[in-house]
């Protein structure tokens, strides 16, 4: 328990230090030259700010969610080996899988996984 207290204390101190450093650093003043596109000293060939596909963003967010699911399920075998309450752990993992399966079905039925616009 003492090591957890140390970790929380160090993390809190690090957050406070980074916030204070960020407040005291000079802010960057954007001007016309900094906002313009730069291609090795030549005039840009086209627009540097292309429109971003919202579908791609949605698929990327879904990938992150399901990647997080895998990261949460990976420690499950260790929980089975080192825990006496495996029945509880099993149902927690099954609940996580069921919730994410329903979320995937919802996205699929709403057309969130269709790539064409």
Swiss-Prot record:
Subcellular location: Mitochondrion membrane
Principal EC category: translocase
Transmembrane region(s): 1-21, 56-76, 86-106
Any GO CC annotation of this UniProt entry: respiratory chain complex I
A Pfam family of this chain: Oxidored_q4
InterPro entries for the chain: NADH_UbQ/plastoQ_OxRdtase_su3, NDAH_ubi_oxred_su3_sf
Top-rank lineage group of the source organism: Eukaryota
Keyword field: Electron transport, Membrane, Mitochondrion, NAD, Respiratory chain, Translocase, Transmembrane, Transmembrane helix, Transport, Ubiquinone
Catalysed reactions, as listed in the record: a ubiquinone + NADH + 5 H(+)(in) = a ubiquinol + NAD(+) + 4 H(+)(out)
Bilayer topology term: Multi-pass membrane protein
GO terms assigned for molecular function: NADH dehydrogenase (ubiquinone) activity
The enzyme's E.C. designation: 7.1.1.2
Family from the record: Belongs to the complex I subunit 3 family.
Job of this protein: Core subunit of the mitochondrial membrane respiratory chain NADH dehydrogenase (Complex I) that is believed to belong to the minimal assembly required for catalysis. Complex I functions in the transfer of electrons from NADH to the respiratory chain. The immediate electron acceptor for the enzyme is believed to be ubiquinone.
Official protein name in the record: NADH-ubiquinone oxidoreductase chain 3
Gene name, Swiss-Prot/TrEMBL: ND3
